[in-house]
């Protein structure tokens, strides 16, 4: 069984009770999964406490080299340990990783104005085999959006990008888990499945708009690239665990 790749948004990361319920359900069902997370809120809090500037360009955090030890500490330290603590409480055996461990992904630097900000490209087939072998021993990977390049330098990677790189590597289903339960139709009812054609029609009609347009296009691109289903769902959805345990994806599912 291919593992689920579950990417947690900032809102989902803070939903400790809901995550604990999810982890317990997945542990009981022995459903393998990989958690991918960022932690922008925690980074902002740390920078503010230390009176460091928080700057963004086109919505992306400027991450100077001198700030990377702090950013990495918040992401791969504070946020990762919180999630791993919940996993332990749920009876799981978590394995803390950064995005590039085991060569699971490769750093691809972005705009130099952003400093140490990068995208993630999928790693090697050997890396995929290593990860799956570790998971077969009962480990649950908890992967932060920190990367290390060939020179040993730290990079800040968008967590969505890390999740996509891992899903691409494994050809695995991907869930973007946030506080948004999925795509709604004109009557505000959840749309359970969307094809590229149907999604573009809803965008043209203005039913999908604003930030949801970005999420939908990202999900469609991910589904097309991985050839596996991709879902947008809410950690607060009461049907979340039932869907996963019955072999379905929650929220709105995008097919390639």
Residue positions per predicted region:
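C-terminal catalytic "cap/lid" subdomain
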Residues: 1-256
